[in-house]
Amino acid sequence: MPRIIIKGGVWRNTEDEILKAAVMKYGKNQWSRIASLLHRKSAKQCKARWYEWLDPSIKKTEWSREEDEKLLHLAKLMPTQWRTIAPLIGRTAAQCLERYEYLLDQAQAKEGDKDEGDDPRKLRPGEIDPNPETKPARPDPIDMDEDELEMLSEARARLANTQGKKAKRKAREKQLEEARRLAALQKRRELRAAGIDIRKHRKKKRGVDYNAEIPFEKKPASGFYDTSDENLPDYQPDFKRLRQDHLEGKMRDEIEQQERKKDKERMKKKKESDLPGAVMQINKMNNPDHVKKRSKLVLPKPQISDGELEEIVKMGYASEVARASVENGGQASDALLSEYSVTPAINKALRTPRTPAEQDTVLQEAQNILALSNVDTPLKGGLNTPMHESDFQGVTPRQQAIQTPNMLLSTPYRTPGEGSGSTPRQGMTPRGAIGTPSQRSVRDKLNINPEDAVMEEYESECAAKQQQSEAKEQLLAGLASLPAPSNDFEIVLPETPAEASEEHKPMDFVEDAADIDERALALRAKQEELERRRRSQAVQRELPRPSNVNTSVLRPTNVEPPLSALQMAEELIKKEMIVMLRNDIINHPTSQQIESLTNKKTRNAAQAVITGNRAALERDPMENFTDEELSSAKNLLRQEMDFVKSKMAHSDLPLEAYSKVWEECYAQVLFLPSQQRYTRAAMASKKDRLESLEKRLELNRYQMTEDAKKAAKIEKKLKVLLGGYQTRAVGLTKQLSDLHEQLEQSQVEMTTFQALRNQELQAIPKRLEALKEDVQRQTEREKQLQAQYSELLYERDSLLSKLQI
């Protein structure tokens, strides 16, 4: 018995891919041909699968609240018309129906009429899905059946065959048509060669012949026009920059990781080449003094100045005194002298109002639809089905705008209006305790507000006039009940001493931390600058200093004959110089000293030098001088220099002489690489001189190499920056040379034509004379011929007359 296959069932991933490829090849109208590739699916199922799931235009994202509201409203307007509702929402009909049933189930579950576990949409074991076209595809098994493999191979072969029977037939027909055209053309050529002209008379078509004419042709105007703007530059794409990573760009994490890696490599190289510099850089980074300074707190200017505050206080004090003087004056006095300084209802609890509750429109609409679906027959009568009120005025629901209550309009320190949160009008005053008993009270007791602001509070002009008249009558009645005036005056003197004493009191405010830090940093910087000025000039200018102190420059004190006063002064200067050098070695080491301390080979020797200098400095400490003493010493030295200069008649030393002396002194100093120290050139041997010169040559070569590398980098950078300008400069230079050649050629031509013009001007009179002579000669010749002609004519006439006689 043959195997019977019922088409349908769950769609698999392989079938979906075959269906996509078939739609790409055959289009969306040949579903029978597409279904022939799928043995288990019919044409109708393939079409439904495409339009319900595989179409790229299908929206498969989560349903939004607006879409749910729109779906429920349209379902209430057009029940069961899912094909009509689907394009309005932007979903498929199956998606709309499934979502609609889900919302109804949710509404029933909300009311408690249905168990959440009892969902009819869930398939039970053994049931078949009635709509498999709207479900995701099932993944392919690892071991596929033979019929599935056969179907896959056949579909792959058919879809890969772009030269089928139809394509071959079309190619063959095209070749036959071309051969037929060539044969007809050859026949017409042979007949034309034989003298038989057979022209093809084409039948005139009604309308426009698109093969012979150009529809909507707009012929250009006659003349020459500049078309250089139409010459587009040749597009030369840089394929290296068209890669995906260049188009998308790098992520920020990748860039940060690369920069960190570069920083690590740079720091590693710096530690290998310049360890002291790296240590100093790390110490500088870890130094809290170099932390980024916080910006100063800038507050806005006060809206009320101190003078205005004083005026307000004085006005309040005056009003309080006036109220105290008429404290027992009655109700009329209280109404006239209302207290404007205190806003009513200031002691109410300050509480932020809550946002109004939001209604669940989707749930309400679902419950309305459930209620309508469960309505009994209207023949029984009774009340209508209770439903929630919906606010739909069209196809789409109206959005519920939720606004946060304005606290500024309902705070107790603002003027209260008709309701809490109402915007106060311009010129309003506080509501007093006593008001006119009417529909709307007049809060302007001292006629401060303008009339327009008062008139705006009433609905009509008549009501405003009536209210004003009532207020006027009440005011007149209150004035009539006033007591007799008393001539008691109280003068209050300003308390200037108290204010003056208060001005001298320190202001009780908390200083900003940023200002404190800034002042501390400024003070620290000032102290560092003062300390730097007290150091030696070699440290201040960062000049090279010796790594050890040579005490052999001192002379022994117990010598015969004893030292003179000048020599003793010189020894004191040397001694002070040695103390200063030791202090600089310990407290202000150079980069070479730091490098020797970090180097394992020279660490012990450098540490021993520092220890010895520290011990010597403890025995003979350096004396600290004040700034005044240092400045006075500098002044004494300057005066002594000026005195010696004037007595010795020395002039100012020119720069050339100074440079010459400096070069001579510098030539006497020689660096010994083997001993790592400087010495005089006269005291060094020939071998030491050669080593020193070799070392200097090596340093010069190294410096030259570094300069060459820097120059190459700068040249490369400038080539990148100025390459386009250089190319343009070459082009402009070539254009300039061409223009210069054209100018020279034009000048030569102009000179030639000028010479030719001069020659022509000289030859014109001669030519005119020659032409005049020719004309005169021709005129005379014509006269002679005319005379001869007249004679011959006369002779002919005479002969004819004789013949007639």
Swiss-Prot record:
InterPro entries: CDC5L/Cef1 (IPR047242), Cdc5p/Cef1_C (IPR021786), Homeodomain-like_sf (IPR009057), Myb_dom (IPR017930), SANT/Myb (IPR001005), SANT_CDC5L_II (IPR047240)
Record localization: Nucleus; Cytoplasm
Keyword Ribosomal protein attached: no
Single biological process term from Gene Ontology: regulation of transcription by RNA polymerase II
Keywords for this protein: Cell cycle, Coiled coil, Cytoplasm, DNA damage, DNA repair, DNA-binding, mRNA processing, mRNA splicing, Nucleus, Repeat, RNA-binding, Spliceosome
MF-aspect GO terms: DNA-binding transcription factor activity, RNA polymerase II-specific; RNA binding; RNA polymerase II transcription regulatory region sequence-specific DNA binding
Description of how the protein assembles with itself and partners: Component of the precatalytic, catalytic and postcatalytic spliceosome complexes.
Protein name: Cell division cycle 5-related protein
Organism per entry: Nematostella vectensis
UniProt lineage: Eukaryota, Metazoa, Cnidaria, Anthozoa, Hexacorallia
Protein's gene: cdc5l
